[in-house]
Amino acid sequence: PGHSSAASDVYKRQEKGLGGLMQSRLQNKRASSKHLSMSLIEMSADFINAYILGSVGKSGQVAGACATFFYNLNAASTLIKSDEIDYAVIGSAEAPINPEVTDGFFATTGIADDKKIIAMQERHGESIEDIDFSKACRPFGDNCGLVLGESSQFAVVTSLEFAIKIGAEILCAVPHVFINSDGIKKSISSPGIGNYITMAQAFSNYIKDFDSKKQTCVIAHGTGTF
C-alpha cells in the first residue's frame, strides 16, 4: 500500500483558490466550482494522488509553515516504520507571490525592500546607484530581510527492503526526523529554543559517525533572512 502526504500554507490564497473565491463578489465575477476545492490545504496531495497518479491509496497532509515538508516526511516515516505502508510520496508546494500575500509579508517588516537592499549594498561597499536584486538574498551572510519565492519539493520515501525489492535508486536515508516548535520568542524571525533542541537531537544521533569529507549536501532553512 502507498500513501501521499503534502500541503501548502499560502498557495490556497491565489486567484485559483481561496483568493479568487474571496475576490469574486468584489470584482463582480462568478465564483468557480474549483475555487473552494483548490483552497483546501491538502490539495497539493489529494489532486496529485487522485487525478495525476490515479492512486487509491491513502492521502493526507500535515501543515507546519516552513517545516511542512519535514512534518510530512515524519508522517510517512512513522507509517513505514509501523509497517502500515510500503512507500509514500511526500512534499510541499507554495506559490505565495500575489499582492495580498506580499502585503502581509511586508507588514511583518521582515521582507527585503528597496531601501533595505540599498543599505545592505552600502554596508558591503558596493555601488548604490542601482539595486542589485540578484544579490538581495545572501545565505549565511549580512542580509536585509526575507526574499519571497515559489517552489515545490516532493520525494518518494520507502523502507530499505522495499527500495531494494523494486530496484529503486537510493539517494539518501532518513534514520530520524526531529521537529520542535520555536517556543516563546521576541520576533517571528528570531530563533527559538525549539530550533536549538531540534539541531541538538539531530546531531547527537549521527555525530559519532560524522565525516565532513563525506557530506555532500547540507540544507539549512532561513539562511537568507537576517
Give a label for each model feature.
Residues P1-A7, Y11:
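Single conserved hydrophobic/aromatic residue that forms the stacking wall/gate
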Residues S5, S59-A63, I85-A93, E169-F178, ...:
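Beta-strand segments within the central parallel beta-sheet cores of soluble alpha/beta enzyme folds
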Residues S8, I48, F69, A76, ...:
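Conserved small-residue
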Residues D9-S59, T102, F106-S127:
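Active-site-proximal gating segment of KS-fold condensing enzymes and close homologs
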Residues E15-L18, L73, N98-G104, K185-I188:
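Short acidic, glycine/serine/threonine-rich loops at helix termini
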Residues I41-A45, N49-I52, S59-E94, L146-A168:
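Active-site-proximal alpha-helical scaffold in enzymes
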Residues I117-C217:
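Condensing-enzyme catalytic core mediating Claisen C-C bond formation in acyl metabolism
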Residues G224-F226:
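Extended C-terminal subregions enriched in glycine
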